[in-house]
From Swiss-Prot:
SUPFAM superfamilies: Prokaryotic ribosomal protein L17 (SSF64263)
Assembly description: Part of the 50S ribosomal subunit. Contacts protein L32.
Matches recorded under Pfam families: Ribosomal_L17
Any one GO molecular-function label of the UniProt entry: structural constituent of ribosome
Disulphide connectivity of cysteines: none
Protein name: Large ribosomal subunit protein bL17
One of the GO biological process terms: translation
Encoding gene per record: rplQ
Naturally occurring in which organism (per UniProt): Nitratiruptor sp. (strain SB155-2)
Length: 116
């Protein structure tokens, strides 16, 4: 049984999963909308929402924390200066997942994840 299991492993090792989420987060921040599988989108949602909440503080330490997760100067700058200030009045719920299609090669359910 899968009851009370903590998180999605996405059939990857922990380092591979961490790299995948980092790259998906950078792509979402830079493009504000990406298409991926539903499982990856749901995992990315919790990852990116925690990052945006940290970025909303707006101070130097928050900037360092966000950069430690993303390791990308442009994505960090865009998140801190453009995206986070938009959500000052909003308490969570910064992303939207829209199911789109099944992928032809392996019939994986696909979805768009976008910043609200």
């Amino acid at each position: 049984m899968r009851h009370r299991h903590g998180y999605r492993k996405l059939s990857r090792t922990s380092s591979h999963r961490k790299a995948l989420l980092k790259n998906l987060a950078i792509a979402l921040i830079m493009n504000e909308r990406i298409e991926t599988t539903v499982a990856k989108a749901k995992t990315l949602r919790s990852y990116i929402e925690k990052l945006i909440t940290k970025a909303k503080k707006g101070d130097f330490n928050a900037h360092r924390e966000v950069f430690a997760y993303l390791q990308d100067k442009e994505a960090t700058k865009k998140l801190m200066n453009e995206i986070a200030p938009k959500y000052n009045e909003r308490n969570g719920g910064y992303t939207r997942i829209i199911r789109t299609r099944t992928r032809r090669g392996d019939a994986a359910p696909m979805a768009f994840i976008e910043l609200v």
